Amino acid sequence: MHDTASIFHADLAVPAVIRTAPGIFVQGRRIRSLVFSTDLAVICHCDADAVLAVYPFTCQPAITQALVAASQRPVLNGVGGSITHGERCIEVALHSEMQGVAGVVVNTSIPIDTVEALAAKLNVPVVVTVCADDAVAARQIEAGATMVNVAAGGRTAEVVASLRSRYHELPVIATGGRTDEAIARTIEAGADAISWTPPDIRVLERAVMEKARRLAAEQLEA
């Protein structure tokens, strides 16, 4: 008989340096790490504090329901941007809130009036993904965005530092980069939480199969 603890364990541990981030509070929980994925197999085997579920299609309620049910932790769900905006975005966001998401995420191209409507109608945080500390980001924050998610590639730490200097209390999520050093720089710049992209499922499966083939070969030699 299998011990439950041995079955449900984290095969994908987020980088330890992320634990040094101060964290953001969502649904009464302190969140320092978010796994950037919609893959349920990855999510269920990762020890991140929350899930950042954003994908390049219109948000589907069936996908949201599956993510919320399986994740067993707060889910920040993408609801709009350049593809989905206006009334459709608002309807999707309201439905996502009723399904139990901890927050909704829109990207930098979202119209200001949509941000205002989301802030007015939702009880969960409205997170805007930004690429720069510019006039667009400022208008979105003024319109009611309650958090920002900084995704600026190699300039992420720089953008985080600029935002932090202007908005001292604004919760900031940011991509951390591929190395512990890059993550540490982003946290030092003022990020409260880090979104972490796990290895591709194909890479993980390849490693498992290489181990399986090695063990099979050893059995033949025994």
Predicted feature locations:
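Catalytic cores of alpha/beta
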Residues: 87-96, 134-144, 178-196
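N-terminal active-site wall of soluble small-molecule enzyme domains
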Residues: 59-98, 109-121, 133-139, 156-160
